[in-house]
């Protein structure tokens, strides 16, 4: 319930994503002026950047209802029909998270719903089967995905607006922490909020989670104000360093450097050495390490960068590191 109370309701309250918000203000004002539903919108980007929150904000700005579901929850056309025909009114928004995981059958039934606001359902089987056409209210579909490459071309082409959410700066994340603190009645210095922001991997969800944990440490210590020093102590206790690396992130780099001489080493081999699932390594840990300039993917395998050596306190290898 705390998260719901902290969720922004308007674009002005929504922190970050300034370029996207500027465009959304135009789209929303135009739709309201024409008294039409907003065009179907696809939001894509890494997890934790606020796609679901933005859908709630858009619904609030338009003064319409929001129905939230996910791709895996819509297994068959009947599930989709039940939502579209029974849960939505004129102008309402249907938000489908992980829309890339829609079944092919459900996705194909979504096409006419998006284009013409109708849906054909087959009743019965064999010679007795008949088709019933459902007239649907004019609605807006907001799809969200972390894997835009898995969105099929026919589905992608039916979105009138396609937008990418970017990682947040430490300063924007600090603003988010300060906002949550203010709403919760927690006193925190700007310096402490910035230290949390610097370790939040560019992700608002992580910043909010770290703020709650730092608040726990401060509360147990009996401190009325979260200072920079208290925040640093709490973040260190959580195993986070100044780049926001967790223990597992550092283990990946250390194994790469100490056991494989900095690489290159194949993903499967590295995963085996770490007793880790290759998919988890590739999708959860590597993106941030690459974005921080600590790891490179090359045709021959993973390579630790000079920055990785220096960050962990190891002397970098003599000569240039292997390049792709």
From Swiss-Prot:
Binding positions (ATP): 14-15, 48, 51-53, 97, 146, 168, 205
GO biological process annotation, one example: DNA repair
Regulation: The activity of RuvB is enhanced by E.coli RuvA.
Main location as per UniProt: cytoplasm
Annotated spans, Head domain (RuvB-H): 242-324
Main EC class the enzyme belongs to: hydrolase
Phylogenetic classification of the source organism: Bacteria, Thermotogati, Deinococcota, Deinococci, Thermales
Enzyme Commission number: 3.6.4.-
Keyword ATP-binding assigned: yes
Organism: Thermus thermophilus (strain ATCC 27634 / DSM 579 / HB8)
UniProt-annotated stretches for the region Small ATPAse domain (RuvB-S): 169-239
Domain-related comment: Has 3 domains, the large (RuvB-L, also called N) and small ATPase (RuvB-S, also called C) domains and the C-terminal head (RuvB-H, also called M) domain. The head domain binds DNA, while the ATPase domains jointly bind ATP, ADP or are empty depending on the state of the subunit in the translocation cycle. During a single DNA translocation step the structure of each domain remains the same, but their relative positions change. Domains M and C are flexible; they change conformations whenn bound to whole RuvA and only domain III of RuvA; domain C probably binds Holliday junction DNA.
Localization of this protein: Cytoplasm
Record GO terms (molecular function): ATP binding; ATP hydrolysis activity; four-way junction DNA binding; four-way junction helicase activity
Name the UniProt record assigns to this protein: Holliday junction branch migration complex subunit RuvB
Pfam families (alphabetical): AAA_lid_4 (PF17864), RuvB_C (PF05491), RuvB_N (PF05496)
UniProt keyword terms in alphabetical order: ATP-binding, Cytoplasm, DNA damage, DNA recombination, DNA repair, DNA-binding, Hydrolase, Nucleotide-binding
Region named Large ATPase domain (RuvB-L): 1-168
Function: The RuvA-RuvB-RuvC complex processes Holliday junction (HJ) DNA during genetic recombination and DNA repair, while the RuvA-RuvB complex plays an important role in the rescue of blocked DNA replication forks via replication fork reversal (RFR). RuvA specifically binds to HJ cruciform DNA, conferring on it an open structure. The RuvB hexamer acts as an ATP-dependent pump, pulling dsDNA into and through the RuvAB complex. RuvB forms 2 homohexamers on either side of HJ DNA bound by 1 or 2 RuvA tetramers; 4 subunits per hexamer contact DNA at a time.
Requisite cofactors: Mg(2+)
Quaternary structure, from the entry: Homohexamer. Forms a complex with RuvA. Electron microscopic images suggest 2 closely interacting RuvA tetramers sandwich the HJ DNA; each tetramer associates with an RuvB hexamer. Forms 2 complexes with Holliday junction (HJ) DNA which probably have 1 and 2 RuvA tetramers per complex (called complex I and complex II). Forms an RuvA(8)-RuvB(12)-Holliday junction (HJ) complex. HJ DNA is sandwiched between 2 RuvA tetramers; dsDNA enters through RuvA and exits via RuvB. An RuvB hexamer assembles on each DNA strand where it exits the tetramer.
